[in-house]
């Protein structure tokens, strides 16, 4: 009877807490289960532990793939997996809900977004600034922080192109038995963050003279994401946009403090993120935050495993100067379209209220030109929508990509990154072989004008190298990854994995 009364009091207390904090129903249910000694697993069962031993399964599976020839043995990959395997064990019973529960009394910024929106809806004055004069409240918050459970450290895995980072991420993510996990491409994640920020700002009352208050939506957005997931896996963590660079520290500090575990892969070590970027000094503190909450693992094996001998899927890359190259691509489109239950027609995709027109499609096949995809003002969100609608995309008239074509080169790199991540099959008709598609030679007219401007400003060569606007370091670095990925996308294994007709 005493045990029953204790459980009843616990449930009443939790209901009172959630009435005040207004966390989501999903979060409330998970905390109630946790209070009864249960843990939620990805299979939907509730038990005191995972239904099978997790430790040992990940590396054993990797060893079996090596044994049967699916993967090539690599000591650095195995060492990284040993570390990730321990994290899979910890994450099985991990939840960040207890970290989200304590609410500071003096700072609306740390309240869930739903309560913030309720206050906005009632036209109450919103003030998220901590009172500087209330030192005692700050001490109380520090005590609350120290009493919170500490989340496990995440991982930041970096290395050259083709060293197996994405493969390790695939293995790790598939073996994590926690249904509150999420895997996203970094570009797509940041697009979603900016959408959330915009939506939150739009929900605020109009500013009036004399009633203006400072408001920063980044932390509420971080809390909103933390309510949805306790593990985020990022593939291709890269920072090239100043709008992203300026909010990363605050965003990720919020995620980490809300108990979100981050596992990321990147081609760059943390110190080289946003290298030569505009206003990089404001970005540098993020590197310290990343190192505090994530273990850094190098995977520089010096081997591009994507270029190893793999059975090709047939001819998928054509050079426009070759005889009958265009006819061959036309024939391939007709062959693929014949299997579709559709007619060849233009198609208009709606992306965030904008229209993206593709002139020639048939079912899940899109026949596009480089001009359609990379010379229009398109971004990662547009390419993700194309990847969602089509499993095979033909890209025609891909030119020599000169260093002066920064916008086109960046869009092309983003396009291939998103297609690769979504297993979209690509057929290309280009002006140059794949390994020579990026022309790093002759200076273009745009670059010549930039150089003249630098001379007129009296900037030294050393100073000019630090100005990302006039350099192509990021484009060259990113394009190496693009070439490696396109090489893998021409293999039979990739082509079969991208076929959605069987799904």
Curated annotation (Swiss-Prot):
Print the keywords alphabetically: ATP-binding, Nucleotide-binding
* Record-linked SUPFAM superfamilies: P-loop containing nucleoside triphosphate hydrolases (SSF52540)
* UniProt-listed GO biological process terms: cilium movement
Q: List positions binding ATP.
A: 159-166
Basic and acidic residues bias spans: 130-148
**Could you tell me which residues belong to the region Disordered?**
108-155
Q: Does the keyword Kinase apply?
A: no
Cellular compartments per GO CC: cytoplasm; mitochondrion; nucleus
Signal sequence range: none
The UniProt similarity line reads: Belongs to the AFG1 ATPase family.
Pfam families reported for this sequence: AFG1_ATPase
One MF term in the entry's GO annotations:
ATP binding
Superkingdom of origin: Eukaryota
Q: Please state what the protein is called.
A: Lactation elevated protein 1 homolog B
């Amino acid at each position: 009877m005493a045990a029953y009364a204790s459980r009843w009091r616990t449930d009443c207390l939790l209901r009172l807490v959630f009435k005040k904090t207004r966390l989501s129903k999903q979060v409330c249910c998970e905390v109630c289960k946790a209070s009864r000694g249960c843990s939620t697993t990805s299979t939907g069962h509730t038990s005191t532990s995972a239904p099978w031993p997790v430790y040992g399964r990940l590396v054993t599976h990797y060893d079996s793939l090596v044994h049967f020839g699916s993967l090539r043995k690599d000591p650095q990959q195995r060492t990284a997996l040993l570390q990730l395997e321990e994290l899979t064990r910890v994450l099985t019973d991990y939840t960040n809900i207890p970290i989200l529960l304590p609410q500071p009394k003096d700072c609306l910024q740390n309240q869930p977004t739903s309560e913030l929106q309720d206050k906005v809806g009632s036209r109450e004055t919103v003030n998220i600034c901590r009172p500087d004069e209330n030192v005692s409240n700050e001490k109380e918050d520090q005590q609350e922080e120290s009493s919170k459970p500490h989340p496990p450290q995440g991982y930041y895995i970096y290395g050259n192109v083709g060293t197996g980072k994405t493969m390790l991420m695939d293995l790790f993510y598939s073996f994590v038995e926690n249904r509150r996990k999420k895997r996203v491409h970094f570009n797509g994640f940041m697009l979603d963050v900016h959408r959330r920020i915009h939506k939150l700002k739009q929900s605020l009352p109009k500013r009036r003279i004399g009633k203006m208050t400072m408001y920063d939506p980044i932390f509420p957005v971080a809390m909103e994401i933390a309510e949805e997931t306790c593990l985020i896996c990022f593939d291709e963590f890269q920072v090239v946009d100043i709008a992203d660079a300026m909010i990363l520290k605050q965003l990720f500090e919020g995620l980490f403090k809300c108990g979100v575990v981050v596992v990321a892969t990147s081609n760059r070590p943390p110190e080289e993120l946003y290298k030569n970027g505009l206003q990089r000094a404001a970005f540098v503190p993020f590197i310290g935050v990343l190192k505090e909450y994530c273990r850094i693992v190098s995977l520089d094996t010096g081997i591009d495993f994507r270029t190893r001998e793999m059975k090709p899927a047939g001819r998928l890359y054509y050079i426009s100067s070759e005889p009958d190259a265009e006819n061959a691509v036309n024939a391939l489109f007709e062959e693929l379209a014949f299997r579709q239950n559709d007619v060849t027609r233009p198609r208009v995709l709606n992306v965030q209220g904008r229209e993206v027109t593709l002139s020639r499609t048939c079912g899940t096949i899109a026949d596009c030109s480089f001009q359609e995809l990379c010379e229009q003002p398109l971004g990662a969100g547009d390419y993700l929508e194309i990847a969602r609608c089509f499993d095979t995309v033909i890209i025609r008239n891909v030119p020599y990509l000169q260093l002066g074509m920064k916008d086109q080169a960046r869009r092309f790199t983003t396009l291939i990154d998103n297609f690769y991540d979504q297993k979209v099959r690509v057929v290309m008709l280009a002006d140059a072989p794949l390994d020579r598609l990026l022309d790093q030679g002759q200076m273009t007219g745009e670059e010549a004008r930039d150089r003249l401007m630098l001379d007129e400003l009296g900037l030294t060569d050393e100073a000019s190298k630090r100005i990302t606007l006039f350099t192509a370091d990021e484009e060259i670095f990113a394009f190496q990854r693009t070439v490696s990925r396109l090489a893998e996308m021409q293999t039979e294994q990739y082509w079969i994995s991208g076929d959605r007709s069987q799904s």
